[in-house]
Regions:
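The beta1-alpha1 cofactor-binding region of Rossmann-like NAD(H)/NADP(H)-dependent oxidoreductases
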Residues: 36-47, 81
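A glycine-rich helix->loop->beta "capping" turn
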Residues: 28-31, 51-62, 70
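Active-site-adjacent segment of SDR/Rossmann-fold oxidoreductases
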Residues: 124, 145-156
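Residue(s) in the substrate-gating loop at a strand-loop-helix junction
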Residues: 119
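C-terminal helical subdomain
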Residues: 159, 176-215, 231
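Conserved mid-core segment of classical short-chain dehydrogenase/reductases
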Residues: 69-85, 128
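Active-site helix of classical SDR
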Residues: 99, 135
Length: 265
């Protein structure tokens, strides 16, 4: 990830898992401030907003990156409504709380940029990820409304429809060890591009193609996505079959995943 030492004081919110990456920023001459918060907690969000406002006068750029993903078909989710509640609480309400809390500071400074890390799954309507995709789609819908309201206030909004990235979030799904994914550096470069150019949306060609097919040929899109749904089954845990041995991906699965690089299966 390229780092340039402008007069910036990044404030990072998260757990200790990313501490090893801070050295790169510090070596570039940036002053890093870290804060720990549970974004799904209203109290933590409110406290974080207060801290950022009092200590730094708010923020110029907010990147909503925290997220929870659940890979489970709807038929295996009938008794797991809490999956939908948990994804909404973090991916939508948590991001919304932070954004709403920090927007007044951007308004007073007459500048700001909100970058929301969404998913390619919103563009492709990825099956087996209904809880995750719905929560990301909710944030996208709110972002479009907000962008229209603040278009004349020098506050920009960017949505990044991130493809599948090789991070600890996908590690429970062993299938992803065999399919092509973005590296964390490649994902970070998309965020850097958003900061520099302030696009309304950043998406891969596959994501844009998926959205076009869903808009212009919805039945064809459903057939394609149903094919992927049947080709890549739920994990044993998601299907309530704990203890069954993990099955390595077939040649057909690997070939399909290579063609659809970055897609959620």
């Amino acid at each position: 990830m390229p780092v340039t030492a402008h007069r910036a004081h990044p404030a990072r919110v998260g757990s200790d898992r990313g501490e090893r990456g801070l050295g790169e920023f510090e070596a570039a001459g940036l002053t890093i401030h870290t804060h720990s918060a549970d974004i799904a907690s209203k109290e933590d969000c409110d406290a974080l907003v207060q801290t950022l406002t009092e200590n730094y006068g708010g923020v110029d750029i907010l990147i909503n990156n925290a997220g929870r993903s659940i890979r489970r078909g709807i038929e295996n989710s009938f008794d797991r409504f809490h999956d939908f509640e948990r994804t909404m609480e973090l991916n939508y309400f948590g991001a919304l709380r932070l954004t709403m809390g920090l927007l007044p500071g951007m308004i007073s400074k007459q500048r700001g940029h909100v970058i929301n890390i969404s998913s390619i799954g919103v563009l492709t309507s990825a099956p087996r990820f209904s809880a995750y995709v719905a929560s990301k789609a909710a944030m996208e819908a709110w972002t479009r409304c907000a962008a229209s309201e603040f278009a004349d206030r020098r506050i920009d909004f960017t949505t990044i429809n991130m493809p599948l990235v090789k991070t600890p979030m996908i590690s429970p799904t062993k299938l992803y060890e065999q399919v092509p994914t973005l590296t964390p550096d490649e994902a970070a470069n998309l965020v850097v591009d958003a900061i520099i150019h302030k696009q309304v949306r950043i998406a891969t060609r596959l994501g844009i193609f998926g959205a076009l097919v869903h808009s212009l040929m919805p039945k064809v899109a459903q057939i394609i996505m149903n094919t992927s749904f049947r080709m890549f089954p739920d994990s044993a845990a998601a299907a309530h079959k704990d203890g069954e041995p993990h099955q390595p991906p077939s040649a057909d699965q690997i070939a399909f995943a290579q063609i659809m690089r970055g897609m959620y299966f």
